[in-house]
Amino acid sequence: MKAVIFAYHDMGCQGVQAVLDAGYEIAAIFTHADNPAENTFFGSVSRLAAELGIPVYAPDNVNHPIWVDRIAEFAPDIIFSFYYRNLLSEEILHLAPAGAFNLHGSLLPAYRGRAPLNWVLVNGESETGVTLHRMVKRADAGEIVASQRVAIAQDDVALTLHHKLCQAARQLLNSILPTMKCGDIPSVPQRESDATYYGRRRPEDGLIDWHKPVSTVHNLVRAVAAPWPGAFSYNGSQKFTIWSSRICPDAQGALPGSVISVSPLRVACADGALEIITGQAGDGITVQGSQLAQTLGLVAGARLNRPPATSGKRRIRVLILGVNGFIGNHLTERLLNEENYEVYGMDIGSNAISRFLLHPRFHFVEGDISIHSEWIEYHVKKCDVVLPLVAIATPIEYTRNPLRVFELDFEENLRIIRYCVKYRKRVVFPSTSEVYGMCTDASFDEDKSNLIVGPVNKPRWIYSVSKQLLDRVIWAYGEKEGLRFTLFRPFNWMGPRLDSLNAARIGSSRAITQLILNLVEGTPIKLIDGGQQKRCFTDIRDGIEALFRIIVNEGDRCDGKIINIGNPDNEASIQELATLLLDSFDKHPLRCHFPPFAGFQVVESRSYYGKGYQDVAHRKPSIDNARRCLGWEPSIAMRDTVEETLDFFLRSVDVAERAS
């Protein structure tokens, strides 16, 4: 059986050797060129391939059509991926008749995504493992072929666990590869309800928060110990790294971050103390804890801290227009949780952001973007990243007020885009899933899918075409005048503070809010055209995390990109959403305070929205760009989102009733 292998790291070397030992013919190996900035402590797949006399390649983009054709020429019977860092396109996965298979460093479906080795230690797990699974379009989601468990000892650190996983991988492959070679390939579907996803880790994620439990801090030290970048803290402006530690249960009443003693070197955490066994000051050498204390000039009672605010770059200034809206207020919370962001915002109200008004890094002005143009231009010039989130985005308004939709959603936002061009500021612009219109693709691709809308006499498309035209204008400004931009397309984000029940009372709300209002008031749930339209519902927490990563823009990977942000796994019809909501409503502890359920009522869309409305049957995103550019994957199940959204609205009603 002929194989093409994609491999990197020690796991890649183990995989290549196991495939050879099982009697496969390896036609070619694809790997990565080593990054000079990375600590390459691991084995070289390219060197191993060269020593074995196997053709080896390291293309920048293995999914380019030229390389896909080249791989096809090898005519592989089977494809293996062993710690190859890039996702393989469906075109490549379909080249091998027997299929494509990936070795993942966890017990799937737990710990899908990046850096599972480190994450299991961060989370204090006692067991992990390796899994060989069939590769499908979605990362780490294919049927399981085989897995092997690995116990995590309390003294395991990243490197010792890495060696255990390599050994387990070799044992697993030695056992299953001969069976697969004979055509006997086990397939066990993964349980999506058990799936968890973790993103990439960065060196800065090693910053210690001394207010966490001591076990959490100790687990972080274990998870990123050498040769990984290490867990670190600061004494004044001096950074130091902790390479090994142990837990001491008694913090002696000291405040978190306080030095309890210097020999041994112990630091108080939330519920105990961390003893620093070895560490390193700055770029110095590794020394034992008491010597580290001496080098840093520590004394008992000293307080360790987060990186000083004056340690270099100023904070990143983010301008959010529409800051009081659903996305704006949740994004503000996420940004203010990071020390290096300052938020400037404008909106016509402040009810959703009242909790931030006294925050020292939040600056709010109540105003209208169509009136306060001077304030906006000044702050576009002042800030680093601009998010124009103001838009009319409820379907009934498209047919009620199409001209107002165009004036606000297109004309006012175009003025802001031109300010960004003028002052050369980066803009993160909210496009919409509506731009795909009546696209017939099974999933909507940002770079390939056609954008199809209905006739001119259907004003419901005014929002879609206004957003689409702005997308095209922004793209042209990027191509012709160097505007730095990212377009993101939310797919049916839901969560607390989505809109209001008052908006639902006048028909100007999202679907779930309207459904909740029906339950609260004891009126029939209206299913427009039977409620068979399908959407992919996305938890606001998943959406905001993706949007935050767009703002961070690691490696400038988001520049010039269009990125769908949605959850393809949470596809449901409006009727199914209503049924799930009703079930959650009946189980809610406040259910007894509301009227009986009044049933479902099928309503024709024309009578509800007017003659200018037209609906679409489905709207499912491809999220390959989000995975590739952001290292992001949605993880929150639709039921959890529905329950949390319902709880928010029911408790807000309860508070109002008690107040009256």
Swiss-Prot record:
Active-site residue numbers: H104 (proton donor), E434 (proton acceptor), R619 (proton donor)
Positions contributing to UDP-alpha-D-glucuronate binding: 393, 398, 432-433, 460, 492, 526-535, 613
Site label Raises pKa of active site His, positions: D140
UniProt cross-references to InterPro entries, sorted A to Z: Arna-like_SDR_e, Bifun_polymyxin_resist_ArnA, Epimerase_deHydtase, Formyl_trans_C, Formyl_transf_N, Formyl_transf_N_sf, Formyl_transferase-like_C_sf, Lipid_A_modif_metabolic_enz
Pathway info: Nucleotide-sugar biosynthesis; UDP-4-deoxy-4-formamido-beta-L-arabinose biosynthesis; UDP-4-deoxy-4-formamido-beta-L-arabinose from UDP-alpha-D-glucuronate: step 1/3; Nucleotide-sugar biosynthesis; UDP-4-deoxy-4-formamido-beta-L-arabinose biosynthesis; UDP-4-deoxy-4-formamido-beta-L-arabinose from UDP-alpha-D-glucuronate: step 3/3; Bacterial outer membrane biogenesis; lipopolysaccharide biosynthesis
Entry annotated with the keyword Ribonucleoprotein: no
Region entry Formyltransferase ArnAFT, spans: 1-304
Region Dehydrogenase ArnADH, annotated ranges: 314-660
GO CC, alphabetical: membrane
Catalytic reaction list: UDP-alpha-D-glucuronate + NAD(+) = UDP-beta-L-threo-pentopyranos-4-ulose + CO2 + NADH; UDP-4-amino-4-deoxy-beta-L-arabinose + (6R)-10-formyltetrahydrofolate = UDP-4-deoxy-4-formamido-beta-L-arabinose + (6S)-5,6,7,8-tetrahydrofolate + H(+)
EC code(s) of this entry: 2.1.2.13, 1.1.1.305
Record has Transcription regulation as a keyword: no
Residues at which NAD(+) binds: D347, D368, I369
Protein family membership: In the N-terminal section; belongs to the Fmt family. UDP-L-Ara4N formyltransferase subfamily. In the C-terminal section; belongs to the NAD(P)-dependent epimerase/dehydratase family. UDP-glucuronic acid decarboxylase subfamily.
Subunit: Homohexamer, formed by a dimer of trimers.
Function, as annotated: Bifunctional enzyme that catalyzes the oxidative decarboxylation of UDP-glucuronic acid (UDP-GlcUA) to UDP-4-keto-arabinose (UDP-Ara4O) and the addition of a formyl group to UDP-4-amino-4-deoxy-L-arabinose (UDP-L-Ara4N) to form UDP-L-4-formamido-arabinose (UDP-L-Ara4FN). The modified arabinose is attached to lipid A and is required for resistance to polymyxin and cationic antimicrobial peptides.
Name of the molecule in the record: Bifunctional polymyxin resistance protein ArnA
Organism for this UniProt entry: Salmonella dublin (strain CT_02021853)
Source species taxonomy: Bacteria, Pseudomonadati, Pseudomonadota, Gammaproteobacteria, Enterobacterales
Name of the encoding gene: arnA
